[in-house]
């Protein structure tokens, strides 16, 4: 589970340089796995300010997970057939959304690896 603070610009899906460095380390440690990887994007419940790119938190969470998956494919050598993405928007919170701290916990990327 990777917190999104510093991972993406607010309301965006481009990977920030610091997050790319972290993903590089994660990718290196996971590269020996022969299993499948699922990258899940999650958001808080604050509606996306429509900027022409993302219509909703569904769009945003899906694109963020796709950005992370694409990084693993391009930079860490994962095969496309072994990587899937999912965007869950605010449907799977791990904290309450009634505080800034809770919302920050809910904005995250989760990487699930099936080591089979």
Which ranges hold each PLM region?
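Periplasmic OmpA-like peptidoglycan-binding domain that tethers envelope proteins to the cell wall
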Residues: 1, 7-22, 29-32, 42-116
């Amino acid at each position: 589970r990777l917190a999104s603070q510093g991972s993406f610009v607010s309301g965006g899906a481009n990977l920030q340089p610091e997050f790319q460095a972290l993903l590089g380390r994660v990718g290196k440690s996971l590269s020996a796995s022969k299993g499948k990887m699922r990258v899940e994007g999650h958001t808080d419940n604050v509606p996306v300010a429509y900027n022409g790119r993302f219509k909703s938190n569904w769009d945003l969470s899906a694109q963020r997970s796709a950005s992370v998956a694409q990084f693993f494919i391009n930079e860490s050598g994962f095969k496309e057939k072994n990587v899937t993405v999912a965007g869950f928007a605010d449907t799977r919170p791990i904290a309450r959304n009634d505080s800034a701290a809770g919302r920050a916990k809910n904005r995250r990327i989760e990487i699930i690896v099936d080591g089979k």
